[in-house]
């Protein structure tokens, strides 16, 4: 039987269409996925992301452990609260999961990992943590919500003040730069998200989340479901685990090369040797596609192009959808290296030209691609 988040009954009261998402009953939409998408780009929306897994790591060797476990380097995290995005790789360089890690104190780090990968992630972390004496604690007593959009931060700050947080805590939250987290009273507030908009992701006790949700709705924040979350993240060029990358895909072939910390050269993290070989040999690449003609780019459609040697090459769309912000169809596609600015996608029995772009289409409500 599918699990329920602490907000399940609230979703029903809000009119959500519920679906089974990796073993969790989650809202797909609350009437109009399109309206929910636009509200996040123009104002503020709230998502229930309590199905995701929060894992706290404690121990004097926690930083050393994470420098071995993760492809990005937590040595970069010197200011308490600072976070980074990283892949957690297997020995062959495949992506076990992508996650966010927060540095809280020298012996206390926090991970937020995907729901679909929870069991294998925890098993992998526990397997490698033992040698470092790191204590692992899953924080399933915490709910997680994401409030996203150009008005999101202002509305959350006002609510935190109304809930009795000190002026000092509210000011500290308001002054956070992107990719920071801070414990403010019962709330862990982070300037992270999955939409390409400003906002917060907020962890709070399960028993407080319904009240918090209702108070945000009362100040005009709109509930949003998985459907809008997917089109928003696709417009932002953000990967979805299981579609755009998985254990058989290198981060170098998933537009995650920037998350690999190659220096210092003597840091031996899991998967490094395989990545060095892949970098020398060359890999496929993840690109963006824009279709301006009538039609919708869908997952698993083939993408064809002729390389500089006149050879026909083929790739595949990993994520595709209509873009509500741009009014055209967009996609992420994994293709052989050497693709130019144009390619061909076959939709039913029509061959349609697509423009090849960097894998990112919208930021802060504005187009960042030309087509």
From Swiss-Prot:
GO terms for molecular function: aminomethyltransferase activity; transaminase activity. Keywords: Aminotransferase, Transferase. It comes from the Bacteria. The keyword Nucleus does not apply. The keyword Cytoplasm does not apply. Disulfide bonds: none annotated. It is an enzyme of class 2 (transferase). GO terms for biological process: glycine decarboxylation via glycine cleavage system. It catalyses: N(6)-[(R)-S(8)-aminomethyldihydrolipoyl]-L-lysyl-[protein] + (6S)-5,6,7,8-tetrahydrofolate = N(6)-[(R)-dihydrolipoyl]-L-lysyl-[protein] + (6R)-5,10-methylene-5,6,7,8-tetrahydrofolate + NH4(+). It holds the Pfam family GCV_T_C. One of its GO terms (cellular component) is glycine cleavage complex. Its EC number is 2.1.2.10. Belongs to the GcvT family. PANTHER family: AMINOMETHYLTRANSFERASE (PTHR43757), AMINOMETHYLTRANSFERASE, MITOCHONDRIAL (PTHR43757:SF2). The glycine cleavage system is composed of four proteins: P, T, L and H. The glycine cleavage system catalyzes the degradation of glycine. HAMAP family: GcvT. This is Aminomethyltransferase. It comes from Pectobacterium atrosepticum (strain SCRI 1043 / ATCC BAA-672) (Erwinia carotovora subsp. atroseptica). The lineage of its organism: Bacteria, Pseudomonadati, Pseudomonadota, Gammaproteobacteria, Enterobacterales. The gene is gcvT.
